[in-house]
């Protein structure tokens, strides 16, 4: 996890502009650097480093003697960099995984380069010989990237929007900042005056397509066909590979563990892989909740079963409420379900940073979208409609769950790794017949649970544990985080304020008091930036005004049972 920042064609004092880059210093607490581009006095790179790989030579922008005209600033992990280096016999100057981007680009251009990368990434690549600038982001947007560009060709790029909002430019008093779309790269011409002109924006990969880099990876050959046992075997192979490749780090690894299916599978597989790799330290797992919450109890059971060094983080309602302002500032969003679910992740990340030496943190993000794990999938009118919804959710991850996972951990200088969003695992899962992936017998993620039933990775009661609403998991059904928040905002937002909400917030007008409260905080930090959120996360196929699973009939029935 690092923070990248760059300016092209700035007409303001660069030393003043560079102060904006300090707003993302939390992403890279180990070192930082600003570097002007030779021959372009108004172009500059900024980098905040979290040293995860190659502590000695990992500073950026990356430049190597063989390509003196290439400048690279990137945030990410390229898991297949060694395989590609050996395959094409590239001569490396460092041990940094990102160096592969320079070699691939020189060999085959930007399209082939980005399609060959197995990992998560956001990058800015400058080619001064050919006068080009390239921006790129991974398929699901696991690593963030924002840009601002004016009509006269001033370009600013940053890992987080907060590093751009205060920049100055002569042609506009208000610089429009927007997220760079996942699964895309952009080509821009670099002009002699340091400004740029966009040439093309290209969507290079669809989540359902097998990635090009699959031709060169070391995953054992998959079995053909869609018979259940064949599919289960292939899923186990790909999931093991997804976890194993993410062990690439020089820092200690930990894992978030809620006791739910997804994080438990990741933790169990991770511990198994660490033992096989003969890693000398015990795996630290981390759970958060209020006292005796279902998540804490389930996570404790998993930790005892797999043998991890387990940490439990307790918080109370006051601490949760007090964290909301910091959380919304970190998230750069006012989406209700994202804010709600981020408080626990923010607080546990804070604990990890202050009390342990774990820096690279695994989690189960992405599984609900990929494997149709949300409770409302029980309402899908057909397997095909469920498939469409799953792909829509994956496409929008960068606005919601992936955003939450990145910002809450990066705020405390941690790096998050998400095996369920592995290219090969996810593309294979999405290639399966729609009817195999839907909930069965009233149980969501049935295929995923069935896949690991005979693996002995987890206790059966965890493997088949019903999905909890997040607010219930970290607290209790009787006094959930959802209810705590509703009671609090009832005293913060009155009916008169709600009656005039459309006048005050004409875009994405909040429909609930909780939504109104979050929007107020957001506007205080980021006035006039409401369009960063195109729409609220909301369950489909039901008439919902609140995203909580507690409002779903199926969940209410299960909770009473």
Swiss-Prot record:
Entry's Gene Ontology BP terms: cellular response to glucose starvation; L-asparagine biosynthetic process; negative regulation of apoptotic process; positive regulation of mitotic cell cycle
Annotated ATP binding sites: 256, 288, 363-364
Binding residues for L-glutamine: 49-53, 75-77, 97
Catalysed reactions listed for this entry: L-aspartate + L-glutamine + ATP + H2O = L-asparagine + L-glutamate + AMP + diphosphate + H(+)
Keywords (A to Z) from UniProt: Acetylation, Amino-acid biosynthesis, Asparagine biosynthesis, ATP-binding, Glutamine amidotransferase, Ligase, Nucleotide-binding, Phosphoprotein
N6-acetyllysine carried by residues: 385
GO cellular component, one term: cytosol
Record-listed Phosphothreonine modification sites: 545
Lineage of origin: Eukaryota, Metazoa, Chordata, Craniata, Vertebrata
Metabolic or biological pathway, per its Swiss-Prot or TrEMBL entry: Amino-acid biosynthesis; L-asparagine biosynthesis; L-asparagine from L-aspartate (L-Gln route): step 1/1
Keyword Phosphoprotein among record annotations: yes
UniProt-recorded name of the protein: Asparagine synthetase [glutamine-hydrolyzing]
PANTHER family per record: ASPARAGINE SYNTHETASE (PTHR11772), ASPARAGINE SYNTHETASE [GLUTAMINE-HYDROLYZING] (PTHR11772:SF23)
Major enzyme class: ligase
SUPFAM superfamilies: Adenine nucleotide alpha hydrolases-like (SSF52402), N-terminal nucleophile aminohydrolases (Ntn hydrolases) (SSF56235)
Asparagine synthetase domain location: 213-536
One Pfam family, short name: GATase_7
Site residues (Important for beta-aspartyl-AMP intermediate formation), renumbered to this chain: 365
Molecular-function annotations in GO: asparagine synthase (glutamine-hydrolyzing) activity; ATP binding
Record carries keyword Lipid metabolism: no
Classification via InterPro entries: Asn_synth_AEB, Asn_synthase, Asn_Synthetase, AsnB_N, GATase_2_dom, Ntn_hydrolases_N, Rossmann-like_a/b/a_fold
